[in-house]
Amino acid sequence: MGFNIERADKPFVVKSPYKPSGDQPQAIAELAERIENGENDVVLMGATGTGKTATTAWLIEKLQRPTLIIEPNKTLAAQLCAEFRELMPDNAVSYFVSYYDYYQPEAYIPQTDTYIEKDSNINDDVERLRHQATANLLTRRDCVVVATVSCIYGLGTPEEYAGRMLFLKVGQEINRDDLLRQFVAMQYKRNDIAFTRGTFRVRGDTVEIIPVYEELAVRIEFFGDEIDRISTLHPLTGDEIDEENEVHIFPASHYVAGPERMERALKTIREELEERLAELRKQGKELEAQRLNMRTTYDLEMLTQVGVCSGVENYSRHFDGRAAGTPPHTLLDFFPDDFLLVIDESHVTVPQIGAMYEGDASRKRTLVEHGFRLPSAMDNRPLKWPEFLQRVGQTVYLSATPGDYEMGLSDGVVEQIIRPTGLLDPKIDVRPVKGQIDDLLAEIKARVAKNERALVTTLTKKMAEDLTDYLLERGIKVEYLHSDVDTLRRVELLRMLREGKIDVIVGINLLREGLDLPEVSLVAILDADKEGFLRSYRSLIQTIGRAARNVSGTVIMYADETTEAMRQAIDETDRRRAKQIAYNQEHGIDPKPLIKKISDVNDMLAKEDVDTQTLLEGGYRNAGKAGNTHLGVPVLDPNEADKRHEEILKAGLPAQDLADLIRQLSEQMHTAAEQLQFELAARLRDEIRDLKKELRQMTEANK
């Protein structure tokens, strides 16, 4: 789609110390060949731990096409985005997920006459990353966007968003006041005191703005009515970072509407209101008509006076100028026509994309019927499955267990089952249910003796709790993982398992996709012959995969009979294992254990604290705040702290301010981590590192 913006055409380049190995080269070549030959749907069936992420990156490098990757949840999306940023540091890797930390949609329950107002909490950093994704898509071709199902929900029109974009160049003739009016029309706010994202400030002939998708501010210096200089600067310190010749500034909102659009929207909303009121009164729904009239009239007044109202997205059809029933504009419309779609964990993600529309529609239908919303609110919705398919081109489905839908579309799958480390799929042992607990206890003890770990999956919470108690009584270090355990506690338990503080985790359905634990050598599946969702072929394959990252990985299924799902899972695992053994023998490869660093956010905080206090006070007293006292280093000479303080004083006021700023940001970093805002914590860490580098240079210069 062209928006009169020339996209920078930089090549995709993967920077990795590794080369494609195992059957990665064959998978990359086959996928690329099929896509270049015009196949629309291709399935990559990649066993756990075979490097599907790296294969995808190398495929993008080979095809040189902008790519959208859809993940089933925010956690996996964040994980994949971080991996892609490491693999493609010079390309635009963006993150596009729902920006709500908390979201309670507007709803009405007729049975109890209960109206629930919309309530939400927006995460500013995720919102910035969403804006960064759309800005990148319109200005560059080397884009990879990692998204969740959020990408099929309504977004403003790309034409209007690009049309309101401002292009500024050194030497350009533009009146300063006209520029300020344009910023306001783009929904930026003037604030000469608190300079934050989405605001601008004016100081004589100098205008500074922080675009919503950037962390750096842009300074525009005028000489009369001509732009004399453009530069980027650090918004906190005011230090200039780079001089620019030209800059694009996109609107502060995806839902930006010019005066003509606003005028037209207000007119069509009034017309729809009149029609709907007549309809409701004809049906004898006087209460509903009165309610609708009152709510919509208030919204119209707000739109006229302020340009925005609560729930403005429900009028998106009027602002976009769409006909009733037509699909909304989404992130997909921001991509060039030749983009590639990758659906990760497709057995989960495909049904998820298909299910979004109906859930949204049933809630809105009730609101419309009872006079809380105009019928046009139904058109502020996610895409239906057929509409989604119309907007995407060639698609790669990634999964260890592809679903029936994608298997039916594709003409044979591309397999990737050889691991670069030579690791094999685990051996599977089926044992009788009688005496299963004592047998399991003996197996766990054997693993503990070898400093290995075990996962046990049961069918019910009750059984998981009872088994955990039984193992605890027998002296096993065990924890129980279930749906009530919050995210941070879950991460902590898995970390404790890897460190050996616990030897066994008992769970129900939480031991499947995306769990990467190289220390686990035993996965025990209790009641494997009870047919159902938790013991289906795909669930079993995903659970078996948790033991595939250890050289001596074994799976024990406790069952009295072999179900069809079990037989399929065992046959598939044996087939893969035979192929892996043959490959290893042919190439003389010995399976190597997967070495994966145990790291978490607490480590990151503690290390940063060590460095900060060593810099500011010449020593490090207590790492307790970060929860890792073992990372503390002894305080140096008692006079060292005074000496360091004197050095900072000698370097002058900027150095003192910098030291104070580092302390403040360190506190903010801890707060962000405590509130699970890990992206913000990591960003603050990077900022602290830059400031510390600057402070070191200042103190060195004054020695």
Swiss-Prot record:
Motif Beta-hairpin: where?
99-122
* Molecular function terms, GO-annotated: ATP binding; ATP hydrolysis activity; DNA binding; excinuclease ABC activity
What residues does the UVR domain cover?
659-694
The UniProt entry's GO CC annotations, sorted and at most eight, read: cytoplasm; excinuclease repair complex
Q: Which SUPFAM superfamilies did the record assign?
A: C-terminal UvrC-binding domain of UvrB (SSF46600), P-loop containing nucleoside triphosphate hydrolases (SSF52540)
Give me the segments passing through the membrane: none
Q: Which PROSITE patterns match?
A: HELICASE_ATP_BIND_1 (PS51192), HELICASE_CTER (PS51194), UVR (PS50151)
**Chain ranges of the Helicase C-terminal domain:** 436-589
Q: What residues does ATP bind to?
A: G46, A47, T48, G49, T50, G51, K52, T53
The protein's assembly and partners: Forms a heterotetramer with UvrA during the search for lesions. Interacts with UvrC in an incision complex.
**Which protein, by its recorded name, is this?**
UvrABC system protein B
Say which species the protein is native to: Bifidobacterium longum (strain NCC 2705)
**Record gene name:** uvrB
